[in-house]
Amino acid sequence: NLNEKRNQLIQFIWKTNTIPKQLPNLIDTNISDERFSNFSNLKQIDRLTIEMEHGLSSIVYVFSPENHNGNVILYHQGHSGGFINGKSTIQKFLDNGFTVAAFSMPLIGLNNQPIIELENIGEVKFFKHNQFVYLESENFSSMSYFFTPLSITLNYLSTNSSFENFHMVGISGGGWATTVYPSLDTRITK
């Protein structure tokens, strides 16, 4: 049963029966980022800050086009760097009227690399995904770091009634997130 599998996966990732329902911790609207100043059909960039367990945070940029088609693309970059590496892809989506929410993998790009106090070890700076194993417990799965920013960003974007459909694409590790996340959240249609 598909719903049963979805519920099991949600329970495994978040240790609850539902995906996160909250909104971003911080929303900065109409920011300036020189790296994207040459974009065409760009109305504004909003920066979402999503704070998670153990002090990890995720920074998401929402690129809004001047002329939009009512659809949103969640674009997830992979392990090679932040979503700046997908600049040409983001521009292509903007050219076609999509609002683009751009994500980087945890600990990469604009996302932080916190120092976390580990029992019996001490303070450790987290900068690689394989360190997440030290955070696993019966009450916490580090898998949530990969999917919580997607859920919270969708919660925020869903408050805008002008969006008709949510789509998702990704590269490398972002492609993996793109394969898994739509099975958890039926708001993603393609």
Regions found by a protein language model. Give the residues of each.
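Primarily recognizes the serine-hydrolase "nucleophile elbow" in alpha/beta-hydrolase
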Residues: 151-190
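Short alpha-helical segments and helix-capping/turn motifs at coil-helix boundaries
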Residues: 45, 56-59, 83-89, 175-176
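N-terminal cap/lid segment of alpha/beta-hydrolase-fold proteins
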Residues: 21-67
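Structured segments of extracytoplasmic/periplasmic soluble domains
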Residues: 8, 12, 16, 92, ...
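Cap/lid segment of the alpha/beta-hydrolase catalytic domain
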Residues: 76-148
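Extracytoplasmic/secreted proteins, especially bacterial periplasmic and envelope-associated proteins
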Residues: 4, 8, 88, 145, ...
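N-terminal pre-domain segments of enzymes
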Residues: 1-23
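The conserved beta1-alpha1 loop
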Residues: 63, 71-78
